[in-house]
Design a protein with these regions (language model features):
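Acidic, low-complexity cytosolic segments
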Residues: 1-157, 161-164, 168-187
Length: 187
């Protein structure tokens, strides 16, 4: 079983790194070729993406990291890896721990660091999450604007009622216009 381990732990102690490596290898062996799986372990999720050619990518994330984005990351990493090493023999001969056999050097995959850095903020890396974040921000602004308009409407009602300068006919016109405009409110 061959895999690329993608740890999302920023300050990994050696013992934690060792455990993450063991946990990743164990899970990579248990996911069937072409399958995907997520396993929960304490405060972390371990996402596993296995390709039909035997290449497996694993991401260790906290619970807040969106699973869909994690699997998008794993798919991108495996695609980039296969683009960099298209011949299976170039990576099938590499041992599980990333070191080469006595005849094969370890594979260098510098793109991995760039991809991991990009995916640290899922809202920036994933277009769907970015759109959702923009929609949420717009919704908050819209709610504030509507609340402000409604608040101004209440103040205007109060001013009209208190005004001695407006005739009874002007007050009736204002109330009638307001009731007719209310049928056209936003839903």
């Amino acid at each position: 079983m061959w895999f690329v381990m993608v740890p999302f732990l920023t300050h990994v102690l050696s013992s934690l790194k060792e455990f993450a490596s063991f946990f990743s290898k164990t899970l990579a062996k248990r996911v069937p070729a072409g399958g995907r799986s997520t396993v929960e372990h304490h405060e972390y999720l371990c996402h596993v993406h296995s390709r039909s050619n035997g290449l497996v990518a694993v991401a260790l994330c906290d619970r807040e990291y969106p699973s869909r984005v994690a699997f998008t990351l794993l798919s991108k990493v495996t695609d980039d890896f296969l683009a960099a090493f298209p011949v299976e023999s170039s990576w099938h001969s590499v041992r599980d721990d990333g070191s080469g056999s006595s005849h094969t050097p370890a594979l260098s995959f510098p793109i991995l660091d760039t991809v991991i850095e990009k995916y640290q903020d899922p809202a920036q890396a994933d277009p769907i999450m970015k759109i959702q974040k923009d929609l949420d921000d717009t919704k908050v602004i819209l709610h504030k604007t509507i609340d402000g308009v409604l608040e101004r409407g209440v103040k205007l009602d109060s001013l009209v009622e208190k005004s001695n300068d407006l005739s009874l006919q002007s007050k009736m016109f204002y109330k009638q216009a307001k009731s007719q405009n209310s049928c056209c409110g936003m839903m």
